[in-house]
Amino acid sequence: MTGRKIIHIDMDAFYASVEQRDNPALRGKPIAVGHAEERGVVAAASYEARRFGVRSAMSSLKAKRLCPQLIFIPGRMEVYKSVSRQIHEIFHEYTDVIEPISLDEAFLDVTENKPGIPLAVDIAKEIKRKVRERLNLVASAGISYNKFLAKIASDYRKPDGLCTIHPAQALDFVARLPIESFWGVGPVTAKKMHTLGIHNGEQLRMQSLEMLTREFGKVGTVYYDFARGIDIRPVEAVRIRKSVGCEHTLEKDISKRSSVIIELYHAAVELVGRLEHANFRGNTLTLKIKFHDFSQITRSVTQSKELTALDVILPLAKQLLREVDYEHHPIRLIGLSVSNPREESDEKGVWEQLSFEFSDWELDE
């Protein structure tokens, strides 16, 4: 599959950049798109804010502690959607094989493209130039022969990045990657990798498939392939999203109510950030609990109104938690998801830690 030409386009600090573009007084200042009140969540942060450690899906209180001079700007989702449509108009000048990941991020398959341009990097350069000239915004682009490598490449030189990973370079490139840079490797998984002596892509590639699946379950197969630069997933032009969710694997099993509530709060904060960034609307909240013995349960509640705000989602999550006997069965994983019940005939895949929906990339980068 090394004959494919895949581009990953990622708008740099999209929501915040749109606000700074439209209001020159905000340029060069640390800003966060979101609400500053106690239960607020950062939906996006400018690069000036990121230098202080402010990140998407962070609670507004924590963001303000990290950066006291942080300026909060209410989100304008309709504006972001309009700008996203303009960006996609540029994409369609080159290909119709476009897989949107969120308003500010997409994969493009330009193996066969409308202008007949032979080099994908030249298409990426043109897209970046047109985005800057027409919209006064900055995009990063990664080019490779599969989606995993294209995504890694777009992250490599942000902001305003352009990076190509050729087939002959892939193994060396992946070998140098810190294990934390692999998609699907969060803090808990990274810590476990470190205890196994795995700190980078080269050390990951040295592990057998048997060992990785034994230690990490079926996602071990994904790690095995990624370490070898393998990703056979096609760019899918139609991508219907049925849910938005997040999971937190805990560093140690917990059964104390106060500890469980704290972890539930963190999951709810992250979920609200993901919902806002993905512009997703649903009215069913699902709580997933995995216990110390790896057994798991899910509990759901459906409301007549859409679930988007933390002060709505968190009380519902606590309500669902009351149905869980965690005092006698310690918890090792907590997950929350919002979905549309009309589309929930099949939940398979929604709660896999790696669902291949790029859920870990859908916060504003």
Q: Which residues are covered by each model-predicted region?
A:
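Gly/Gly-Pro- and Ser/Thr-rich, intrinsically disordered tail segments characteristic of DNA damage-repair
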Residues: M1-E215, T221, V338, R342-D346, ...
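DNA-contacting surface of Y-family translesion DNA polymerases
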Residues: H8, S181, T189-I331, N340-D364
